[in-house]
């Protein structure tokens, strides 16, 4: 809230204290005539002590201070404005006060309505979920699950190296069915003895939704066709020597694979890859600083040797005398 207080000089008044805030009658005159609210606010003369008190920001409208009659020695009368210009100026001031009141009026702000925020969480893509599951498996986030997967895959590959695929599939199915049937019969027996509810111990896995929607199936098929077409195009460019440098690199790699095939078969190589996939990530995570240091040293040596070899190849041959 703001306050404005202004005074004007009055040389005829004996003191600044007055019972009325807006007028000083002339000498020998008494102001006994009552003034109604319809009349304008009496205008001060240049020689009267006046003051104006304005309050800004009040919620109630500005009201004009009441004018009381001043009693004196002589007969009272209302002091009239000597000029019409002063009267018009006072009207403009009153209008300005009203406009100022409307502008500075404080309006009560309605309380904020607290609304529940609805957050739409996008459903993760199947590829992202699979990648996250494989990463957790290789980094041994769940020790029991990682141990079971490594043991199962290793035993399967060892069996495939000694027996046929059909025999391994048949014996594997028999082992799994023997375990699940034993657990199911055990729960049925407990229910018959009233020591259990007889629920299926594999109900959680039975309730898991494994169905693919049409959109997901289309995405998987499109991704598979894209990968197959890219592989075929790459092999075509390598075998038909589209780029001589790439074809020579492919020739060296295939020649080295002949030596690998002479020592190991496909199952053994696959078994080594599985063991390395479950071993190297966790070892790198535990000794990351040392591994990065040695890798940087090896890369510097290789880059130095490559730059030296390229410099020798670009050097022009010496002229024969």
Curated annotation (Swiss-Prot):
A single Gene Ontology biological process assigned to it is:
intracellular protein transmembrane transport
Q: Where's the Reticulon domain?
A: 134-321
* Family annotation (Pfam families): Reticulon
User: Which keywords appear in this protein's UniProt record, sorted alphabetically?
Assistant: Cell membrane, Cytoplasm, Cytoskeleton, Endoplasmic reticulum, Membrane, Sarcoplasmic reticulum, Transmembrane, Transmembrane helix
The region called Disordered is annotated at: 1-32, 65-86
Instruction: Check the record and name the InterPro entries matching this protein.
Output: Reticulon, RTN1-4
Q: In which tissues is it expressed?
A: Isoform B is expressed in the anterior structure at the mid-neurula stage, localizing to the neural plate and eye anlagen by the late neurula stage through till the early tail bud stage. In stage 25 embryos, expressed in the head and neural tissues. Expression is restricted to specific regions of the brain during the tadpole stages. Isoform C is expressed in the paraxial mesoderm at the mid-neurula stage, with expression shifting posteriorly as the neural fold closes. At later stages, expressed in the myotome of the somite and in specific regions of the brain.
- Which residue stretches does the UniProt record annotate as biased composition, category Basic and acidic residues? 77-86
Query: Superkingdom of this entry's organism?
Result: Eukaryota
Q: How does it sit in the membrane?
A: Multi-pass membrane protein
An annotated GO cellular component: Z disc
State whether keyword tRNA processing applies.
no
State the signal peptide span.
none
Listed transmembrane segments: 163-183, 263-283
Query: Where would you find this protein in the cell?
Result: Endoplasmic reticulum membrane; Sarcoplasmic reticulum membrane; Cell membrane; Cell membrane, Sarcolemma
Reply yes or no: does the keyword Nucleotide-binding apply.
no
Report the protein's function.
Inhibits amyloid precursor protein processing, probably by blocking BACE1 activity. Enhances trafficking of the glutamate transporter SLC1A1/EAAC1 from the endoplasmic reticulum to the cell surface. Plays a role in the translocation of SLC2A4/GLUT4 from intracellular membranes to the cell membrane which facilitates the uptake of glucose into the cell.
**This protein is called what?**
Reticulon-2
**The encoding gene:** rtn2
